[in-house]
C-alpha cells in the first residue's frame, strides 16, 4: 500500500488506566441517513446527513462514532483530518470488539 494511506485502521493505546481506541474513519457527508459501519480502504465508514460545510459533517461524524461505540461525545477526539473526509479519531473507553463489529456491518 502507498505510504500516504492511513493504516492501520485501529490500534489500542493505553493512557494511564483508560484504554483509547484510535480509529481511521472515512466520512461520507450528505447521506440520506446517519450510519456507522463498513469499511473503505482500511477505514471505518461514517455516513452523516450533514453537509461538509463549516465543520458540520465532522461534528456529526464525531457524534455518530460516539453513539456507535456507546460512549459520550466528549470521549471522541479528532486527532487528524479536520478538513479531510479521511480522519483519525481517538475514542476513550471504547471496546475494541465494537470496532470489529462495526467494520463487518
Feature map (PLM): residue ranges:
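Contiguous, often N-terminal, cationic amphipathic patches that form binding interfaces
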Residues: 1-63, 68-73, 77-105
Amino acid at each position: 500500500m502507498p505510504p500516504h494511506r492511513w493504516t492501520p485502521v485501529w490500534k489500542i493505546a493505553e493512557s494511564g488506566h483508560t484504554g483509547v481506541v484510535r480509529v481511521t474513519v472515512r466520512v461520507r457527508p450528505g447521506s440520506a441517513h446517519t450510519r456507522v459501519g463498513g469499511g473503505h480502504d482500511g477505514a471505518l465508514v461514517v455516513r452523516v446527513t450533514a453537509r461538509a460545510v463549516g465543520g458540520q459533517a465532522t461534528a456529526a461524524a464525531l457524534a455518530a462514532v460516539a453513539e456507535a461505540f456507546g460512549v459520550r461525545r466528549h470521549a471522541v477526539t479528532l486527532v487528524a483530518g479536520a478538513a479531510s473526509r479521511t480522519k483519525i479519531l481517538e475514542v476513550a473507553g471504547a471496546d475494541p470488539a465494537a470496532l470489529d463489529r462495526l467494520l463487518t456491518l
